[in-house]
Design a protein with these regions (language model features):
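Walker A (P-loop) ATP-phosphate-binding motif of ABC ATPase nucleotide-binding domains
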Residues: 4
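Hydrophobic anchor at the beta1->P-loop junction of P-loop NTPases
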Residues: 7
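The conserved Walker
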Residues: 11
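Hydrophobic positions on the alpha1 helix immediately C-terminal to the Walker A/P-loop
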Residues: 18
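Active-site signature of alpha/beta-hydrolase-fold catalytic machinery across serine-
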Residues: 21
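Active-site catalytic microenvironments for nucleophilic, acid-base chemistry
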Residues: 25
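Conserved nucleotide-sensing/catalytic segment adjacent to the nucleotide-binding pocket
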Residues: 29-75
Length: 75
């Protein structure tokens, strides 16, 4: 797993709950409500779990290749 983790998905899918568990288990900091892929590309730091409602899978694939990206959805 890469040192920067991004969890994306629609509101209410459990992103923040998952991020809290991962951050605690891995001893990473949590950054909730990341505004955009461009902001994250410029400002991201290692050993952090980031959460976003607004970043799409396509944006993450293009801009955030050095992240482990987890996409969460309702079933």
């Amino acid at each position: 797993m890469k040192e920067k983790i991004l969890i994306i998905g629609r509101p209410g899918t459990g992103k923040t709950d998952l991020a809290n568990v991962l951050a605690e288990l891995m001893n990473y900091d949590l950054v909730d409500e990341v505004p955009s892929a461009q902001w994250l590309f410029v400002n991201a730091e290692p050993r952090k779990v980031y959460v976003s409602n607004s970043i799409t899978k396509a944006e993450a694939t293009v801009y955030l290749r050095n992240f482990t990206v987890i996409a969460v959805s309702n079933l």
